[in-house]
Each structure stands twice: as structure tokens, then as C-alpha cells.
Amino acid sequence: CSTWGGGHFSTFDKYQYDFTGTCNYIFATVCDESSPDFNIQFRRGLDKKIARIIIELGPSVIIVEKDSISVRSVGVIKLPYASNGIQIAPYGRSVRLVAKLMEMELVVMWNNEDYLMVLTEKKYMGKTCGMCGNYDGYELNDFVSEGKLLDTYKFAALQKMDDPSEICLSEEISIPAIPHKKYAVICSQLLNLVSPTCSVPKDGFVTRCQLDMQDCSEPGQKNCTCSTLSEYSRQCAMSHQVVFNWRTENFCSVGKCSANQIYEECGSPCIKTCSNPEYSCSSHCTYGCFCPEGTVLDDISKNRTCVHLEQCPCTLNGETYAPGDTMKAACRTCKCTMGQWNCKELPCPGRCSLEGGSFVTTFDSRSYRFHGVCTYILMKSSSLPHNGTLMAIYEKSGYSHSETSLSAIIYLSTKDKIVISQNELLTDDDELKRLPYKSGDITIFKQSSMFIQMHTEFGLELVVQTSPVFQAYVKVSAQFQGRTLGLCGNYNGDTTDDFMTSMDITEGTASLFVDSWRAGNCLPAMERETDPCALSQLNKISAETHCSILTKKGTVFETCHAVVNPTPFYKRCVYQACNYEETFPYICSALGSYARTCSSMGLILENWRNSMDNCTITCTGNQTFSYNTQACERTCLSLSNPTLECHPTDIPIEGCNCPKGMYLNHKNECVRKSHCPCYLEDRKYILPDQSTMTGGITCYCVNGRLSCTGKLQNPAESCKAPKKYISCSDSLENKYGATCAPTCQMLATGIECIPTKCESGCVCADGLYENLDGRCVPPEECPCEYGGLSYGKGEQIQTECEICTCRKGKWKCVQKSRCSSTCNLYGEGHITTFDGQRFVFDGNCEYILAMDGCNVNRPLSSFKIVTENVICGKSGVTCSRSISIYLGNLTIILRDETYSISGKNLQVKYNVKKNALHLMFDIIIPGKYNMTLIWNKHMNFFIKISRETQETICGLCGNYNGNMKDDFETRSKYVASNELEFVNSWKENPLCGDVYFVVDPCSKNPYRKAWAEKTCSIINSQVFSACHNKVNRMPYYEACVRDSCGCDIGGDCECMCDAIAVYAMACLDKGICIDWRTPEFCPVYCEYYNSHRKTGSGGAYSYGSSVNCTWHYRPCNCPNQYYKYVNIEGCYNCSHDEYFDYEKEKCMPCAMQPTSVTLPTATQPTSPSTSSASTVLTETTNPPV
């Protein structure tokens, strides 16, 4: 519906009429509703131009008047503007407002003169009123009221809405003007100039044109018809008709274009820019100034001129770089080329960190958390001399099972044994050594009061933070690439296989991965099933308050936000503060970890400790604190033997040291050079953690308290042959007792046990190894572990990408010919990239999920997948409303629980599999990609892709190179410091507003949190227990809680069920089929299709006379059996041992049941509602001759 000129109108039903009035009128609204979805009003001035427009969209009110736009509670705004699902931006020579919410879409356009247009959805047919009519599809009844046909003025009087302080008298009724026929031919000719072949009916526009000419100050002047010709041009453009450049300098000119732009009557509003030169959209053309063909708008520099792509500048951290400029970042050098950064990777050391008691970050930047009490292999490598191995000791540090923390680092080789703990260094014979210490190629010294450094000549550097929390940082040179194993990962640039176990298979959860690298006979690591902050609201508030300094604006940490994303450090800080009884040491440790990361990027955060009272450091012995210090030239010992302490680090070290010109002596006092002493031999003292045994009870010294185990009995009676009992009190053959009992798990690690204390117990006889069920077996009979299950000799398993065979306790794996990776978009803005990076955002725009053709030379993309996200909760969370898949000239749109296909591409093969719960698209781009796209008809969308080319992929789904470290690569090819900067770069529509923060819906809707946590707890329950060891459940549980809190404008249970279904699907991808739905919890009514049939092509269902009981719900197809398609839950009409073959279009039997897997261990119960869908085979061998 539109109005233009001095008072021309065209209703929703295309009825044209004329009316001139200066009162405030309702242009269009939803009738008979107290709170309509929209209410648009307008007022004309005495000059007949539109003086004011009021647009009410629920609580949002936009007022347009006198060339200004204001928003209630915001004030006057600048364009482009985006907030609360509303976008306002220039659109050629006009201004366009687009309101996109989950339940509504509306477009309003105006030109600040005489033109106003509203475009609404068909669902409002028959429900509107105002000057735009009733929108019922019949143009002749728009003026009917209570059964009577009204004239124009009486109809308009009904739409009048006075301002609160006015009474606007209705205009006097005048006789409608009759158009002069003498202008009819001229007007037809003028309209033909605009578009001679346009299918929009011309009669009404000819009439409006005639009226314009006769009402002109000089009757018959053609220039008086410009507004009607412009409206006809707009109507033709909206109908996708050809429109010519009909304006001239002297006829209906709209003025000159700025810079080097040119005028187009029908130009694309999808402006191609340096930031997004491939921008495309479905909007119709409009008139205005545009860049000439072959150029793009420079939206990066300030001049906003049209340039060739080669002339586009680049941007980085708010700075603009000219084409050809170079910049250096950590481990890469980049050159600005066609608006993108063309980067080359440089040799770079690998870094692994152990922080915050329980957090580990691998060489390939994968972060995880675990809670175990044991000695673990941190890193083993063939590049370490003398069979060197780096280990980490984790001990209990509190009462709860999750209060575990790093207590010591061990370096072991055939030549050295070095144990570094809090301010102590032990060597081979548990002898305490005073620092500095040197042994061959290894030098250990204190860099400051807080850090100990181990420097080697073979490419390994270890820096240990001793206070406030014991932490370790490992650095290895590039020669170690692809040659490491252990908790620090395999350093091959691929994040996805960092959980490679000692048995040579990749696990799905951190605890199982960590357990495989135990260097002692310890209990398995335990999972923290609940958020520690959920146990105390006071602790939660305190943790969030203190840790929020990391993310707040105006703090010392803000200066680093553009370089290092503070969000993961904030989350760690909150977790540590709630998990550990000693809160502030862990808070300060978390803040220090962020500051250290910033300093590694060249940004030292001076005085950050002063911003938190409990984090300040008090130095003793007249030492001074520095954020960048070193031991060299600061100790007396460094004067006589500089090689012991003069080894700088590439990351600044903080702590206490002597001021320049002073040196630390043996009393930890700073003295002048002339007063430096000579050191005496190390003093003797008893080590902590030694044990004593009295009457069969063994006690250990832990944190100043005795912790005792055992009972008065003869323990040797519990040992059954071939095991034997070894006592710590009288054993001569093994002074560490059962601590180093030979196990199959230890055999898989390939190293010797590194004991820390003696334990009495039963051990296997020589040559035998203890397996998972406690039996002693020869090494060739050792089982393999995967996903918490045990597999015997010769058994095979199939993972997503490999076929693995168990041999001598280790997996021997062969890569499958085709391996896919998955990107998930689900719920309220959750994304998991192809390489496993997780993030959440609340963007209200169209975003590129994935596309190819991302190289600097910008080849044409063969596919592009775009999500349209809109606001779906009062807290501001956003969800995906539609998905657009572009395959060359072929387009597939997913929206409103259905799909549409337009265009053709003979090079692409695709088929559609329909299910009551999902739509699945199999797409083959020959020579490039095999894709399966799965949509649950709501907010969840999955892209499974395998490729036959090294073509680069980009978008919100990451770059699919196996390394999540660089997944936040922006459109201009540099790696963003945080997810929001990354997300903003992948907007498909550059006029959308940027996202500046992530909403926490549980904080905004606290009354929903308890319900959300209760309903989502099924993910942590016994129902999903069989999957807990295959897929880390905590991210899915947290996403479920967030979505359940945020989904507050209807469909809250649907949001919760969708979130749980995502975890169930992740389990199914790992071969675990979970039957989790019930008639009371997230039910699916597949039985409906047994008694209802489609009535025709319209798709409506009606009750059938016959009842067919074949349709039923299944959580998967062919559980524990072979199935050749992507396995998803749904409504199926095949029997339980059949599946529907889409090629043969009939039910086919599942493959034969494979050999059963070994039962789970006692610590891993199996739910009766669970079955394993992974293929398990048994490898057979020929009998001996």
C-alpha cells in the first residue's frame, strides 16, 4: 500500500483513490486488537507533502518528521540504525524500515517528501484497516463500512486519529475532480518512457497523471507528473519488471550524484562494497546513485567513493591500511590485497598451558577442563633426548571431588629426573636442590618471586608460576610439530584430533582422554556434572562481580579487548571462583592469565593488579614488583655465573625482583654488588607428601594434615593369584609398592611409571598386566578402550572417519575414503564450527554460515549458505528464521516449516528427504563437495560436508582446516580477537547494525532459570549416560538452559526440546542412539499420520476412514546395525528392523547385527533406553597350521 504526490493512494488490494487532508490518519494497522502488531500513521502539511510519520511496532515507536528520525526512549538516530529487530537504512533515494521478528515481518519506506509505502505479510489479509483498506483481495469493497459504501471523505474521516491535544476538523467534502481526457495520451506516453512492457496496470496511473497535470500551477506541465511516474517506476520495479532511465536533467531530476557514482532508475539496493563485494539479496531495484559496473563502494576509508576491487583498503583493529600495506602478527605476516588480508603462516613455537587448577590448553589451542588426582603424561616426544617425558602431578586441594589442582611438574629422562613444585626442586634421589640448578643441557632458575623457568638446549622451555596458583606453561620449538603426545596434544595444527589417547584413538571427552595418559595406577578423572556456581547464589554473585572486571568497559583490561577476547577468561574466572574454597587466589590467577596472554601479544597491562585489592603483590627484602622483569642482573649468583639465570622468555614475566643495581642474596634481600655472598651447600629437610605406615594404616601429609587410608587387617589375603601383595613397610624389591603396578593402560603409554608416594596393594606377577576388570593378562591380550567401553583383541570399531582394530592394547586406525565434518546452528544463536569452535551471538541480520571461493583472488563460489536471524525473545536473543542455500543459479529457501526451490544448476545434484521432524538435503557438487543439510523446521540447522578439493571455506562455520585456533577468521581474512568482531564481519547485509554484546537471558528472566535447569538436567541424567563418555554434555546443557530462559514469547517448551534434540543428535553422530522422548516430555505424535491423510496438493491433512498403524516415532534407524544414510530421529513407517531406502523408495532390512561390543565397565552404566549405533566388527585370524 502506498501514497504519493498531493494525495494519491493505492490500497493493499490495488484500489487507487485520491484524498487530501492535513489531519493525522491511520495509514495501516491491525484491526480489532488492543495491542496491534503494527500501527502506522501519517500527516500531510499544507504543502501536501508528508510532514510526519508515526510507526508503532509493539513497544517500539519511530517518528519521522522534518528530515529527522527519532525512536522513543532513544532520541534522534543516525542511519543506518538497528535495534530490537528494527533496521532503518537508506534505500536508494528513499529510507526503508524493516521490522523482522519471529512472528512478523513488515517493510515501511518513505522519501522524506510525498511518498510512503507499507509492505506486509499475507497472514494479515482481511485483518487490516486504515487508509490502506481491509486487504481482503477485493479492491471494490475497501470503502465499505457496516455494509455501506462510503465516499472517499467519509472513509478517510473514519481513519482520522487526533493527537492527544488537538481536535482536527475533517476537511470539507468537495466534488472529486474529473481528469481531463486531453492529457490521457501524454500520460500514457510518459508512463511508457518509464517501462513500456511493465505488467502493472496503467489505467489508474494514467488517471493520477491526468489529475497531476490539470492541478499543476501551470496546467499541462509534464514536471507535475513526476511523483506519479516515480510511483509507477517503483511498482514496476517491485514486480521485477524492466525499468528504463527515464529521468533527464530537465525532467524529474533528483539531483547530481556525489563523488563518482552514477544515477540508475533501477539499481540494486544490495550495495557491493569493499567489505562485501559479493553481497546479494532478494530486494527489488530502486532509483538512486550507484557505483558503475566493475566497481564497489569503498566503505572502509572515509571518502566512500567507488573504486575497483584492487583499490580496496583493509582494516584491522580500527586502523585502515592501503592496498599493498603489510602487517605482522603472531606467527604470520599479511598483505592487504583487494580489501582482504593475504596472510602467510610463519614458523611458530607451540605453547601448552596448565592454568586455574583444572584447565589445559593444548599446542593446537584446544582448551578443556578435567578433575583428576594422579600423575599424567603432559608431553612425550621423540624429539626429546634420552627418552625425555614431561609429566604433571594433580592433587586434591579441597573437600569436593572437583577441587583438584596442579601441584608439580616432572621432567624424566634416562639421564635426569626433575620435580618442580611450589618453590622447590627435587632431583633423582628425592634430593632437594637450591635454585639455580644445572644438569647438562637443562638449567632451572627463578625468574622472579612468582616464576621458575626451565631452559633447555633442545627446544623445550618450561615456565612455572608458583603463586597465587601453581600453573605451568610449556613452549616447544617448531621441530616438535607432529611429534608430541599427551595432555598437550599432538601439535599437528589440527585441533579436532587433540584428544588422541595413548591407545591411538581420538576420544570425545576430556576425562577419558586424560585417563589414557595416567602415569600411575590412579582412579579415573571425574566429571563436574553441575555448575559449581549453582550451589550458592552468593558465591555466584561474588564470582561474577569480581570477574566482570575482565569484560567491563573503562577498566585496565579494556585496552586489550581488541587483541584478546576476554569472554573465555571471564568464564574460567567465574568457574574457578565458585569451584575452589580459596576464592581470591583463583580469581587473581584467572585475571593474571588474561594479562599474560595480552603481554604475549605485545600489550603489557600495567597496574592491573591495583584494580583488585586481593591481587596486589607485596615484595620482601626491599624487592620491587614489575610486570616485566627477569632474574638476569638481579641476583648475586647471576654475577658469577650468568649462564644459570640469564635466559630471557619471549613473554614478559611479572613478580618481585631487586631494583636495578641491586642483587638478591641468600637471605632474599637486595644488596649492592659489593655485599653479595657465596652460597653454601643445600640444606637437608624432610620432603612433604612422605608416607608412614602404622598397623596397616597408611597416612600421608597433605596440605599440613594427615590423610589416612586402610584398615587393620592382613591385606595379602585380598590378592588372588597370579597377583601378589607388596607392602610399603617391608618391601625390598619395590619401594613404591603398588603405585607402579603394571597395567594395560600404562603399557599403552609406553613409558615407565613415575611414582610420587608408596602404596601397598596387589600387583600382577612379572610379565602380566592388569586389565580394566582387574585380571592379569599377557600384553598381547590387553584390551583397548574407547568411549568408556572396553574392546578385546582383534575387535574393530568404526568412528566417523576411521576404522580401528585393537592390537596389543592399542588402536590401529585406517582413514575412511570419505570423512565429513559438521557445523551446527541451533537454538538462540549457538554455533559449533566445522573444527569444533563453539560460540553464541545475538545478531539480527542475515549472516553467511558457509561458502567457498574465499581465496584472495576471489574465485566464484559454488555454494553459499545464509541464515536470517531475528529477535525471538524479550531479552533480545535471536534465532534463525530462515536458511537460504545458493548453488549457482539454484536457490533453496527454508522457512515456515517448508522449503522452496527456484532456478536451475545442471552441475549440481541434489535430492530431498522429508520427515515429520526434519528436512534433509543431499547435495553433490562434482569434484568439490558432498553435503548433507539437515533442518528441523524450526531453529536448528546442520551442515555435514566432505570435500574432494582443498578449496577454502569461510563464514560463521569457520574455515574447515582442522584447527579451531583460527576459526574466527573474518571476511577480510584476519583472525578476530573475539566472536562478535568475527560475526559482524560476516553480515550479508552491510546495513545491519553490529552486535556489541551477548545477552544473558537467565539474568534478564531469573524466574525461568530454575525451570530451565530442571528440564535441561535430562542431559546430565541416566537417560543420556551412555553418551556422556562420547560427547561432552556440558556445552549442550548450558545452551539448553540459556535457550529455555530466553524463549519467552511463545514456544518455550519447543525451544527446550530443540536444545535437547541437538545433544541427542550429537550422540547419534557418535553411534549412540538415545530414546529420550516420552508422551509427557517433548512428545512427537507420529501416530497422527496413521489416521490422517493429505487431502490434495495443498498439503492439508484430514481424518481418513481407514486406520494404518505403520507410522511411529523412532530415535534412530537400525540401532546397533548398519545404516547407509545420515541417521536422524523421526517418524517412520518401516518396522523396527527396517529402514526406508530413498533410492528404491521402499522399506529395506537393516544389515545383520554385528558382534556385540564388550560391556561397559562398572563405572559406566548402560541405560535401558540406549543402544549403540556404531558398527562393531570382529577381526578373524586364520588358525595356526
UniProtKB/Swiss-Prot annotation:
Skewed-composition ranges (Low complexity): 1160-1178
One GO term (biological process): intestinal cholesterol absorption
Glycan attachment positions: N223, N930
Xref: Pfam families: C8 (PF08742), TIL (PF01826), VWD (PF00094)
GO MF entries: antigen binding; virion binding
Disulfide bridge positions per record: C1-C132, C23-C168, C352-C488, C374-C533, C823-C957, C845-C992, C854-C954, C872-C879
Post-translational modification as stated in the protein's UniProt record: N-glycosylated with N-acetylglucosamine (6.7%), N-acetylgalactosamine (0.6%), galactose (1.8%), mannose (4.6%), N-acetylneuraminic acid (1.0%) and sulfate-containing glycans (0.7%).
PROSITE patterns the record matches: VWFD
Residue ranges, annotated region (Disordered): 1160-1185
Cell compartments where the protein resides: Secreted
Entry keywords, A to Z: Disulfide bond, Glycoprotein, Repeat, Secreted
Residues of the TIL domain: 257-312, 619-676, 737-782
Domain VWFD per the UniProt entry, residue ranges: 1-169, 350-534, 821-993
GO CC terms, sorted: extracellular matrix; extracellular space; intracellular membrane-bounded organelle; supramolecular fiber
Function noted in UniProt: Ovomucin, the glycoprotein responsible for the gel properties of egg white, is composed for 2 subunits, alpha-ovomucin/MUC5B and beta-ovomucin/MUC6.
Subunit structure, as described in the record: Multimer; disulfide-linked.
Record PANTHER family: EXTRACELLULAR MATRIX GLYCOPROTEIN RELATED, MUCIN-6
Protein name: Mucin-6
